[in-house]
Every structure is written in structure tokens, then in C-alpha cells.
């Protein structure tokens, strides 16, 4: 099994401004799966990075504050966001992530590694029927919808949770292979790991609950939210 870094991660590495970026991998949501760490290490090493990890199984692999704040990029893998959040809080990784963010470390990730930075969103952490998660870190003061085009429950549940005020009135959602750059807490640009048609391909969405109605605006890859 092998993996090559996609455009989004390569762009994140470029944003560090370092010739050899220090990358910290965090795969809590997958139970610190060793195979996933191995293929991730290989991919980032081939890209010229110094790679470390922040594990919690079977015990923390480093002091969270020291490890995360000493990185240029923290990349969080997918899996169970509910388990991720519980374990991060148990081990103080949540506070260390905030310290890293406030110090300018680039934070990113996929699936659970996207949801965790927001207020909450939809998750399969509890089973095949999707449920809300509302206790994410909240660095980004919006709800988040991941796998928006790939799982039939995702879009309608996000809309319903916003109508019911379980989630807030503003969310950002992404189809598979698509991501959103944030500068501080402001959504700026839509990016993708694939060569997709901005008009018809996978996209990002700004979802708003306004005067009792859901208003969803599509942003193709390369678009700006400004």
C-alpha cells in the first residue's frame, strides 16, 4: 500500500515557507493505525519533510504542546471524530492544538480532520445512521459538512440540524477531494486534490439558514469566498 501527497497537502507545505517542513501526523480518529502512519511517513518523507507523530495509543508519544507547537504543519487523518475529540480532551491535545494555531502552525486534515476544527457537523462516529457532533474544537465558528456528495444522508441532515438550531446558522461543506483554505477564521479559497471541472465537478458550499430557509451557494474549485 502506498500514498502520494495531493495538491492540497503540497500547497499546505508550500505555505510553511520552509525548505524542509516539520510535519506532525495525528491519526487519533483511526486509533493510531500503524499502517496508515507508515504510508503517511513514506509520502511526507518523499516530499522532503521532517515527519513526527502525536499518538495516544498505547500512551502519548510526546508532550502535546511541545510536539504540536514545534511543527510547521499538523495533518489530522479521518475516522471517528467523536473518539478523536474525547481522546484529545483527555490528553490535553485540544489545548495544545489551540496553542499551535495561535502560534501560526498550519492545521489541516481530511474528514474527521476537517470537522474537528469547526463547531460540529454530521458524523458516522455512532453508526451507519449519521448523527450530529456539536462539541468540536470551534476554532472555526461554523458547522462543517464533509463527504457532501458521497453519502446520501450528509446534505439533508446538515440542513435539518441547522433548521433545528442544533448547529449554527452558517456552515461550510465540501464534496470528496475538495477542501477549503481558511486564513484565521475566514474561508478564502476552494481547492482540490483532483483535476476537476470548476463548473460541474466536486465543489464547496456555503450553507446558510436565513429567515427560516436554507440557502446553499456552490463554489467551484479555484473560487474565492470573498
Show the residue positions of the predicted features.
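C-terminal and late-domain segments of enzyme folds
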Residues: 1-18, 25-38, 42-46, 121-123, ...
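Portal/gating segments that form or line small-molecule/metal binding sites
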Residues: 24-26, 30-83, 87
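Hydrophobic anchor at the start of a short beta-strand
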Residues: 51-52, 107, 202-206
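An acidic, phosphate/nucleotide-engaging active-site surface
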Residues: 70, 83-102
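Catalytic nucleophile loop
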Residues: 75-78, 97-120
